[in-house]
Design a protein with these regions (language model features):
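Active-site beta-strand termini and strand-to-loop segments that position acidic
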Residues: 43-47, 109-114, 124
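Short, charged/polar surface micro-motifs in flexible loops or helix N-caps
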Residues: 46-50, 58, 75-81
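Core segments of cupin and vicinal oxygen chelate
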Residues: 8-49
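Acetyl-CoA-dependent GNAT
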Residues: 54-59, 124-127
């Protein structure tokens, strides 16, 4: 058994792709319109696990604080550098960090994507 993908509703597919593909460097792998009339776009990093972004103008996203989704973690080489670069190049909000997480043996930071979804940037560190 393996995780294949996670699906997230978004308000603007192009803005979402600009962030995840353009700024974070993930790869767009597929796109189609589903039976629910939603535009579905898939992206992934180096692993086979994908993120599915769904958009339908008739779908109410709700407020970020009322969603049950907590966060998405993305591995990076340099948390501090990525935070600095993303804050310069995008409208992302830094929620917490960068900080050392000794329990996770990583340097982490929490930011937002264009729809307010929380993204954890994770730099694995053996020295923590």
């Amino acid at each position: 058994m393996d995780v294949i993908h996670s699906a997230i509703w978004v308000s603007d597919v192009e803005e979402t792709l600009d962030f995840y593909v353009g700024a974070l460097g993930l790869e767009k792998t597929n796109e189609f319109v589903g039976g629910d009339d939603a535009r579905n776009v898939y992206v992934r990093g180096e692993s086979e696990t994908e993120i599915q972004f769904k958009h339908n103008p008739d779908h109410d996203l709700g407020e970020p604080s009322t969603r049950r989704f907590d966060h998405l973690a993305i591995e990076v080489d340099d948390t501090d550098g990525e935070v600095e670069r993303l804050r310069e190049e995008t409208d992302t909000e830094l929620l917490r960090g960068p900080l050392d997480s000794t329990g996770a043996s990583a340097r982490v930071a929490f930011i937002t994507d264009p729809d307010g979804h929380v993204i954890e940037l994770v730099e694995p560190r053996e020295d923590l």
